[in-house]
Amino acid sequence: MFEKIEELERRYQELEALLADPAVLGNQPEFRKLSREHSDLSALVESYRNYKKVLVEITGNRELLADPEMKEMAEAELEALEEQQAALEAEIKLLLLPKDPNDNKSVILEIRAGTGGDEAALFAGDLFRMYGRYAESNRWRVEVISASESEKGGFKEIVASVEGDGVFAKLKYESGTHRVQRVPETEAQGRIHTSACTVAIMPEAEDVDIDINPADLKIDVYRSSGAGGQHVNTTDSAVRITHLPTGTVVACQEERSQIKNRAKAMKVLKTRILDTIMQEQSARLAADRKQQVGSGDRSERIRTYNFPQGRMTDHRIGLTLYRLDAIMAGDIGEITDSLRVYYQMEALKQQSEAA
């Protein structure tokens, strides 16, 4: 393990020299590429350097054990240093796990109302606002691509892009069925109703990820319409694109410009097709190892939001928090961080079992 880290530390030093080279500074694409690599290695190199410092201190304290006057102090320090050593070793093992190549990507977020009718649509709107506020706190940009509004408020379906650094890394475990338990405003008897929404988080496809043959596309244009079905535009600006080989259909009418709607629809189409490929690969891997870890299975019920109790429970990791108001206001960092740590530990366990 440490030979590999020494090699990576040497590469880190090379990158520092390259990033200071005027020739690299003048080549922005190359500079950005090397900067990303430097950034990816920085946490590992810092932890490894701290680890080496702790080893030196441990050696020094062990030598002091032979001195009767220093023995008691050396033993106390040695215990603390050995705890640091163990913690840094665990941290380094996590940092050495293979990186998900999609982690730095922006995402397409899709929320669909499921069982529960109007109440499910209202909850879809609540979830969209929750993710929107979380995105805002991370300085990400959210742009609605398509939305089907419910007559009572909320959304039957909403599709949006969330753009920024590391969006997929933080949101990828949000895919699945989100269940809500609360008393609807129209419920005279005060009975708690249960409804659900499905969330899909897909890494945004880039041109290098997927190549689509234009001959495989059927493109329709039509007039955009509002929530009640009335036409809100006098020109054929709305666009529907069908990918014939897979039957994937994407429509977009949010923009007044047909060109912009077409570009947005193509972005979602590519992302959905890439996501289908990734899901198939994930299923094959799961079959090979007889279990599916952190796959984001869309049919899986992952979370319950219980409004009467002010409680949120994530069923995958058994995490329960009694601060639902803050969570619905976008304070979901503790949830996303806990999920990332859990699945990292699962991956580490699998790596150890395979070794």
UniProtKB/Swiss-Prot annotation:
Gene Ontology MF term list: translation release factor activity, codon specific
SMART domains documented for this protein: PCRF (SM00937)
Modified residues (N5-methylglutamine): 230
Post-translational modification summary for this protein: Methylated by PrmC. Methylation increases the termination efficiency of RF1.
Keyword terms, alphabetized: Cytoplasm, Methylation, Protein biosynthesis
Main location: cytoplasm
Annotated localization: Cytoplasm
GO cellular component term, pick one: cytoplasm
SUPFAM superfamilies per the UniProt record, alphabetical: Release factor
Gene3D superfamilies, per database record: 3.30.160.20, 3.30.70.1660, 6.10.140.1950
Purpose of the protein: Peptide chain release factor 1 directs the termination of translation in response to the peptide chain termination codons UAG and UAA.
Family to which the UniProt record says this protein belongs: Belongs to the prokaryotic/mitochondrial release factor family.
Protein name: Peptide chain release factor 1
Gene name of the encoded protein: prfA
